[in-house]
Amino acid sequence: MNKTRVRNIWTGLLVLVLAGPVLADEGLWLFNMPPAEILKAKYNFVPSPEWLDHLRLSSIRFGGASGSFVSPDGLALTNHHVGQGAIQRLSTPERDLMKTGFYARTRAEELKVPGLELSVLQSIEDVTARIKGVERPEMTAAEAAEARDREIAALEEEESEKTGLRCAVVNLFSGGMYHLYRYKIITDVRLVFAPDYLIAFFGGDQDNFTYPRYDLDICLFRLYENDRPYPTPHYLKWNTSGQKEGDLVVVSGHPGSTGRLLTVSQLAFLRDVAYPWTLANYERRRAGLQYFSKRGGEAARNARGPLFGIENSLKAVTGYQSGLLDPVLMEIKLKEETALREAVRRDPEIDKLYGAAWDEIAAAQKTYAEIYKMYRYFEGGAGFTTSYFSTARTLVRLAAEKPKPDAERLREYRDVSLPAITRRLTAETPVFNDLEVFNLTDSLIQLQKEFGSLPEVKWLFAGRLAEDVAKDLISGTKLGDPAVRKAYLEGGLQAVSLSVDPMIKLAWLVDPLSRGVRKRYEQEVESVETRNGALIAQAVFKLKGTAVAPDATGTLRLSFGAVKGYVEN
């Protein structure tokens, strides 16, 4: 392949924003395990290590979404809907950037976004042998999970201290592989350009997740380091000539999650338990936010972002569920699983090692169905939908977890995560109390319907209406003040345990119950899925080889496809 063609491939992320349709090939591939043979056979292209490094270092993780460097001085391109939270954060009643759009004519006019951090993946290392090496045959699934968690915590801490980077172990193939990802974190991020909301989201929710779509869903930020634009030789250059039919295009990004490797019992759990609850929750919340928006003015402006998020998620999960409700698709999955299980049974040695894995996972789904609602309402926070409760829980759990050895903490409170937690808690971000009361009231109503007989819920309500409880909690808390949050951070366990803030008291009240259902989930569901998912992955590797892409995990992946025309109906 000539240099011009490779250069065009490098610009694929940009081209995809504006160009014609690309039919993606199967698989979201790891940067350190690209499908070289497939690319060679189908496109006569083999990505070199230098090519992969360039694309990886040109790619940016925007929270749970994706972007890319587009200049040598830190300019970054992403979607408007990805940057929407930052744009909303920078807006005021007098300066609604969602309504007017924004353009910085000079770097001095660029707007720094409080609390936003972006990351660039510096390297990947296969650490499967170390992580799985702590497992012992006599261990239960829960004991093996605890051993792996301790080893993961130790490795992440070692590597973070050694490199100065944020290091995270990523679980692939349901526990079949573990890779260490090392990230450079940039916390000085400034808005450069954003179109107004009507252009960026033209067509509204009706056009969302459809093709073709006609809107300008882009925005530009600039990353800074030491108050200077972040210098990088790795960025995607604009391709003014575009692509032609048949050209290979490569997309680099952070797909959230996929379920190609889930078992039939796991898919059935999603179809019958998780997605029906999730869809009902989203539909109710969407209707509520639409009603709240009718107040007009600031209410409509403040609800715009949350409403978009709910509508976006609702449409996505509706699509997932429609696939699971399709008997033809489910029959295909059942036949695939049956064929794999039969292949395992034909080899007594493989069957002895892996044959029971599917039944173990199926049993875990029954347990998950029993605890699902309690897990979502308490550990998932669905019963306390307000940013104040999220803040209070973080303070309470951080205070309780920090005195423990790193490996014994809840995984989200390990040392590697503490800088990000501190930045988030001390950032000055707007909170809209009317909207917080509205959301909390709605969630408390549902909590009381489902779990009104629990002592914790009875104590919380004390004979009051949900709206009165919400108003008392929101009006009484001081957690909207970053100085107060900082004082709790610095005061540690003593300050947080002695707090009379009603939101912190609520977080303490429900924490034992939340931890209990979380522990049951981790020991009886998650650990079982991980152990047996890894066994199924190993069976697949033995029977089919390793030329398989793992499911998406929110980490950086590659996707390939060719530009094709189509007939519009």
Please give the residue ranges for each predicted region.
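Bacterial N-terminal signal peptides that target proteins for export
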Residues: 2-10
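Bacterial N-terminal signal peptides
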Residues: 10-21
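Terminal presequence/propeptide segments associated with secretion/organelle targeting
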Residues: 20-569
